[in-house]
Amino acid sequence: MLNRIQTLMKTANNYETIEILRNYLRLYIILARNEEGHGILIYDDNIDSVMSMMNITILEVIGLTTHCTKLRSSPPIPMSRLFMDEIDHESYYSPKTSDYPLIDIIRKRSHEQGDIALALERYGIENTDSISEINEWLSSKGLACYRFVKFNDYRKQMYRKFSRCTIVDSMIIGHIGHHYIWIKNLETYTRPEIDVLPFDIKYISRDELWARISSSLDQTHIKTIAVSVYGAITDNGPIPYMISTYPGNTFVNFNSVKNLILNFLDWIKDIMTSTRTIILVGYMSNLFDIPLLTVYWPNNCGWKIYNNTLISSDGARVIWMDAYKFSCGLSLQDYCYHWGSKPESRPFDLIKKSDAKRNSKSLVKESMASLKSLYEAFETQSGALEVLMSPCRMFSFSRIEDMFLTSVINRVSENTGMGMYYPTNDIPSLFIESSICLDYIIVNNQESNKYRIKSVLDIISSKQYPAGRPNYVKNGTKGKLYIALCKVTVPTNDHIPVVYHDDDNTTTFITVLTSVDIETAIRAGYSIVELGALQWDNNIPELKNGLLDSIKMIYDLNAVTTNNLLEQLIENINFNNSSIISLFYTFAISYCRAFIYSIMETIDPVYISQFSYKELYVSSSYKDINESMSQMVKL
């Protein structure tokens, strides 16, 4: 099996081979090393991230294991409570999602009945979901004629003498609970179909849930420590045996991983006496150090580990930064060299435990020298980038692309006096992220050539992006930027699917789309009904001039690292959906997807295999490379 995986890894440069590799990753975790000996754990959920960071065909596959757990995710964002909007029809009134729909109904009825309105104003009413308690209140106020009666009871002739009673249709709706509809006209009423929606757009648009990006960038410097975790191979999979820090201590324990981690955490706690947050800086730590520690994280140790964050029971935080994500693909030694520190080799990971134990003294010495070099390089880089990309600071970001683009967006938007805003609450964040689709859409399986947009930056820099806080609208306004909750119906004829949905058997579904994606979908023959939207009245002017100014500064630095950054930005931006500028990303991705679709319109659909927002797979038999295709590069 190991030989098979090693062969697949060396040839994992095409879609078919990568898919075969994924199948094995459902059963095994690959233990690999790069050319500098840094360990890398590859599993089903992180292979795309690994491939975006490095060429996996040159990695050395050391072994396979089933003993190593996956990287533990952050606590999931609470699911947005399902939502039903208010419907005020001539035959009935259905309140919006509420813990107390009966109270909403009596308040609605008070708009027509002055005596109810007067009683509410004079005495008020306690929240309740009990019909008997509502009726008791009505009776005590001399309003028994308006008593609430369930529709089924009324039809049994039990309450026909109460001509002014409030007839309610009672129901239980999945994931919502009890709901009531006030029946205004018995003769014309039929129970309506009510859309149960994943988001309450009116709530999401509230001003207090949005903040200016610039307000989040003014952060003071936090204590920084370089760190590296080293792992050895045993019969039961890899284990951490050494944790090195600089400036700081090195912890070594071959007998108890639990004690190794506890000693490290005790030291962390001791150095946090004067601060509530510190930064640990590693290199490729997201691919080895953190997931390896996560496997053995002790229960009841006073700390929880979630992705790159450690949180103590008293609220202290340790943020574990991966400097590799700010290196533009440089090796550790090249990164240190280009930021002015002496490059030192580091101990190899995934060596035998017996070898590590025998050479522990030299490994400690080698580790400390390597970490000192990393620490000095990081401090120099962070100082340079914080000048270049002011007011952004490295520790506020997980990737250099986010830092660069945030600085440009902030500079351009602040110069216009408008500013870009971001959601400060989980629910609006989830709404924005739901509109970001990075998945491939499969059209048909055939041998294909892969094409990629030549310059994502060229496409996105000439477009407009939202400025200011959003407003709620029922339907978006043509010509304005908005993100809408949509009911989507796919075309009945043969079509290229341009709106991603994970159920091929469903012809109508609800999803979140930008105004740009809505235009693209309508062009492709989809029917779109908007169910509420966040709309922006102002736009940030095109970013091209701001990008050019920043790019000129990068050129002026004339360093390999910054030139690599420039190349990476121009040729291959990899967006993500968990960034302070996710609002920018969602529209940038939509603009790229619209560009891809404009190229697909010039190609016979039978030749299209699959596509994403920046890549297109076209049948190998397709020969008519037109002018539109010249804007893409064949890989």
Curated annotation (Swiss-Prot):
Stated induction or repression of this protein's expression: Expressed in the early phase of the viral replicative cycle.
GO CC terms, sorted: host cell; host cell endosome; membrane; virion membrane
A Gene Ontology biological process term: microtubule-dependent intracellular transport of viral material towards cell periphery
Entry-linked SUPFAM superfamilies: Ribonuclease H-like
Subcellular location: Virion membrane; Host endosome
Sorted UniProt keywords: Early protein, Host endosome, Host-virus interaction, Late protein, Membrane, Microtubular outwards viral transport, Viral release from host cell, Virion, Virulence
Primary residence: virion
Known partners and oligomeric status: Interacts with protein OPG164. Interacts with protein OPG064.
Role description: Plays a role in intracellular enveloped virus (IEV) transport to the cell surface through microtubule transport. Together with protein OPG064, forms a complex that interacts with host KLC2 (kinesin light chain isoform 2) to engage the kinesin-1 complex and thereby promote IEV trafficking.
Descriptive protein name: Protein OPG056
Organism: Vaccinia virus (strain Ankara) (VACV)
Name of encoding gene: OPG056
